[in-house]
């Protein structure tokens, strides 16, 4: 007789319950959404089979991970540990690793694919005599579980190079690594600076590498992955201060800033009537730089004597208005110019932060045809303390969700921009979006059908996304770390939406600049959601002053009044979206609960089956017939009693687990984000009287 192997299942489920209780830290919105706080290992070889540990919240119903656009199935080994096999054709690079499960897709964490062998540091190598032996052209990976340093030994021949590199920000960890290379005598020979330790051996010897976290912080967030290379870092190009390099319209120079803020100089000739844009890209490429751009008019007399007259000294890029939900400053300057006569500019470029980080100097003939869009996960406004939230990029079933879109490097002459995205998850429709002329912020919305399957895909049409790396409760007490990466992923959550809002008309709504516009709204509600809604208009003005739509409790319709005159909207086209909170009860750990209920049902069925077999055997015992095998019947009867007892015990255990899950994770109010479809308006000139 089949007896369910229930004991292990109960233990597994109990672990799952404990791991899935917490809601995303510090978030105004508390609806279930997968959040990855760390992963390990931080990398592997193409084609490797590894056990991947995923830490975070709401990691229920695991399906797969996304490595950029590649979907890799997950096979559960134990709670939050999964077996995966990397595709053999993955190219060596840094990838965005995202979890996909019941509630959609998580934020990304960095995962490196490399052809180098990897050595794991468990932390047992906390003293020099316990140093872990490593070799050149390999990777060392570990995590600081205690404040002790990690020690490694490496054999080097005279003249061999050792370059050890690690950048915690690049790997999306909190680790700030200190590293030192020591001689066999213990004398320090080289130190890690800006994530690089470079050393050339003066003699054959066994050298020691010591690494520790800068402030001796510990925990799963403090991992590292150091590449040990035999190739010396490239020598910096020597540029004399008197060097002046030519540059032409349409060209891009890629180089490094000079040490201690020394300037680099370029001459740019132009003809009358030419239009061009001078752009410096460094800070927005992820470097901690503050480029300084000085432009002067260059003239030469017949003898070749130069005369310089100031043209412009360009500061940081202007702040985006209205401000996005995630801080997105740009310290990269740009300057647009239309030449009235033939001439030349003397361009001087340096870094106010005096780094030697990379930069790009672009001389564009015109604004790029394809906007360099950046997607942000919008959050609910109104937090009393300004912090950092990871946000969500998941559409609930039967609901609408939106991504906030930033178009950097735009100016007053930038053309309107229609927002589109392709390669959507199954069951999802793109509702589009809009950024007006000269504006830099907009919203693109997506709607999921009521039966859309949980899943995710990497969107096309939006090249970049920006994330808060770690949730921060108070940005005045802790730094909010951001990371800009590739295209955003959009997920579908199996959790139904409490409501979504639609305008009765989806075409462009026209209004005079001195008038009010009434917009009729339709509300589709979940059966369990009857509360009133207060929605803010995002994308027009600063969120603190944004107009609101109030929809009464239980109402299926409402109205949004836009006072264009009060908002001082200039004539032109605008796009915005309505967003607000909605509370609805949600029970987390539904997978654990469903599994426990399935075990309970299995145990109850086993009780019935064993009971029937017991009664059948008792009837044979009490009223035997010729030909009955009484000995076999007694054995079967004994097994039936044992099976029934085991099934009763399994039922008791399953019932206790269900009670435990419901007690620890009862249905609770969760705050969702409710959206409308994107709304377009056209503000017209006031009619002359």
Where are these regions (language model features)?
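Acidic, Ser/Thr/Pro-rich low-complexity intrinsically disordered segments
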Residues: 31-79, 88, 92, 102, ...
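Short, surface-exposed loop/turn segments at beta-strand-coil junctions that are enriched for proline
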Residues: 85-91, 198-204, 216, 338-342, ...
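Short, basic, low-complexity termini and linkers enriched in Ser/Thr/Gly/Pro
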Residues: 3-21
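Sec/Tat signal peptide C-region and signal peptidase I cleavage site
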Residues: 23-27
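Charged, low-complexity interaction regions
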Residues: 619-630
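Short, solvent-exposed loop/turn segments enriched in Ser/Thr/Gly
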Residues: 47-52, 91-96, 150, 398-404, ...
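Aromatic sugar-binding surface patches on proteins
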Residues: 77-83, 328-333, 438-444, 554-561
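Ser/Thr/Pro-rich low-complexity tracts
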Residues: 28-147, 212-248, 254-258, 350-358, ...
């Amino acid at each position: 007789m089949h007896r369910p192997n229930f004991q292990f299942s109960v233990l597994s489920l109990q672990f799952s319950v404990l791991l899935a209780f917490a809601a995303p830290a510090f978030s105004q919105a508390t609806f279930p959404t997968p959040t990855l706080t760390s992963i390990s290992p931080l990398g592997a070889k193409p084609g490797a089979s590894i056990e991947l540990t995923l830490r975070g919240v709401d990691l229920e119903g695991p399906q797969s991970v996304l490595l950029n656009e590649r979907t890799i199935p997950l096979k559960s080994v134990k709670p939050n540990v999964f077996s995966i096999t990397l595709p053999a054709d993955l190219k060596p690079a840094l990838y965005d690793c995202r979890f996909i499960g019941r509630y959609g897709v998580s934020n990304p964490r960095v995962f490196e694919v490399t052809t180098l062998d990897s050595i794991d540091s468990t932390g047992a190598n906390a003293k020099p005599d316990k140093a872990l032996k490593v070799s050149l052209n390999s990777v060392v990976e570990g995590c600081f579980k205690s404040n002790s340093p990690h020690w490694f030994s490496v054999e080097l021949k005279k003249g061999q190079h050792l370059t050890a590199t690690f950048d915690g920000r690049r790997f999306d960890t909190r680790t700030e690594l200190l590293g030192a290379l020591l001689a066999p005598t213990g004398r320090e020979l080289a130190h890690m600076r800006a994530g690089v330790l470079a050393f050339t051996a003066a003699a054959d010897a066994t050298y020691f590498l010591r690494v520790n976290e800068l402030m001796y912080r510990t925990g799963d967030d403090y991992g590292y992955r150091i590449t040990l290379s035999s190739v010396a870092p490239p020598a910096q190009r020597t540029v004399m201060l008197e060097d002046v390099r030519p540059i032409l319209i349409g060209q891009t120079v890629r180089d490094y800033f000079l040490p201690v803020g020394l300037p680099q100089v370029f001459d740019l000739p132009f003809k009358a009537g030419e239009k061009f844009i001078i752009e410096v890209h460094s800070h927005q490429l992820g470097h901690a730089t503050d480029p300084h751009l000085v432009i002067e008019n260059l003239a030469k007399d017949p003898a070749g004597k130069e005369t310089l007259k100031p043209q412009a000294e360009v500061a940081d890029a202007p702040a985006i208005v209205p401000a996005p939900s995630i801080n997105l400053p740009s310290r990269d300057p740009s300057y647009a110019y239309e030449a009235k006569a033939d001439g030349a500019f003397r361009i001087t470029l340096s870094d106010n932060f005096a780094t030697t980080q990379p930069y790009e100097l672009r001389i564009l003939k015109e604004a790029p045809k394809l906007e360099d869009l950046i997607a942000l996960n919008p959050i609910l406004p109104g937090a009393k303390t300004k912090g950092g939230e990871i946000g969500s990029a998941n559409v609930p079933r039967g609901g609408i969700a939106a991504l906030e879109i930033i178009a950097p490097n735009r100016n007053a002459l930038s053309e309107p921009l229609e927002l589109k995205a392709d390669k959507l998850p199954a069951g999802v429709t793109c509702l589009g979006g809009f950024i007006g002329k000269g504006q830099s912020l907009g919203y693109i919305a997506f709607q999921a059908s009521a039966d859309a399957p949980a899943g995710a895909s990497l969107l096309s049409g939006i090249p970049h996304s920006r994330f808060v790396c770690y949730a921060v409760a108070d940005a005045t007490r802790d730094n909010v770390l951001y990371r800009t990466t590739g295209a955003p992923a959009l997920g579908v959550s199996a959790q139904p939406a409490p409501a979504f809002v639609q305008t009765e008309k989806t075409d462009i709504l026209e209004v005079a600049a001195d008038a009010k516009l009434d917009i009729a709204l339709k509300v589709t509600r979940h059966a369990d959601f009857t509360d009133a809604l207060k929605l803010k208009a995002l994308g027009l003005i600063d969120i603190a002053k944004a107009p609101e739509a109030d929809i009464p409790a239980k109402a299926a319709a409402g109205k949004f009044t836009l006072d264009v005159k009060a908002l001082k909207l200039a004539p032109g086209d605008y796009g915005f979206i309505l967003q607000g909170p909605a509370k609805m009860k949600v029970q987390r750990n539904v997978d654990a609960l469903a599994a426990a209920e399935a075990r309970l049902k299995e145990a109850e069925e086993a009780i019935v089956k064993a009971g029937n077999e017991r009664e059948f055997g008792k009837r044979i015992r009490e009223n035997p017939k010729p030909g009955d095998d009484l000995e076999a019947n007694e054995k079967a009867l004994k097994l039936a009693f044992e099976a029934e007892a085991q099934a009763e015990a399994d039922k008791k255990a399953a019932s206790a687990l269900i009670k435990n899950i419901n007690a620890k994770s009862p249905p609770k109010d969760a705050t969702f984000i409710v959206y409308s479809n994107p709304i377009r308006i056209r503000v017209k000139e006031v009619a002359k009287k």
